[in-house]
Amino acid sequence: NFKGAPTVYENDKDITVFKLLNFQNASKVFLSGNFNDWSTGQTPMQKTDSGWVAEVKLKPGKYFYKFIIDGQWMQDINNNLRESDGHNNYNSTYYHYNYNFKLEGLTDKKNIILAGSFNNWNEKELKMQKTATGWVLPMFLKDGTHTYKFIADGEWIFSNPAGWYG
């Protein structure tokens, strides 16, 4: 979802890090989003050698945000996840995950796709990430009961028959 390295991620202390690359000539940069009621001054970003950074403690969920660079609003151009802001522009979107799907083994496979009730059984959307021992995919799931299966190189395979409850 990001062009290059992620510009929003969770650090090892479960703090969400927002990065704005470049703009070193800016004098003030703020982070604004639904997590701070779209405040224009509550979350200042700190200047670094590669741009600007802010750390925010977020609960799992879906978040919208923009940067305010010397008074000018701007979406995160390095984040491909975005939704209309209702004013003919876009908000950048970030999901703080609450679940990590894991599938052990099958390391000989080229692709594993996760499909389930949470994405209308879409067979292409959720590509899992290969690890040394299997496959993983962190996600944000709404509370409720979810059923799912895996697709290994185009072939439907087993899943946890009990599904996931949260």
Which residues does each PLM region occupy?
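Eukaryotic non-catalytic protein-interaction modules, chiefly N-terminal intrinsically disordered
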Residues: N1-E10
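Aromatic-rich carbohydrate-binding modules that target alpha-glucans
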Residues: Y9-P60, Q72-D143, I151-G166
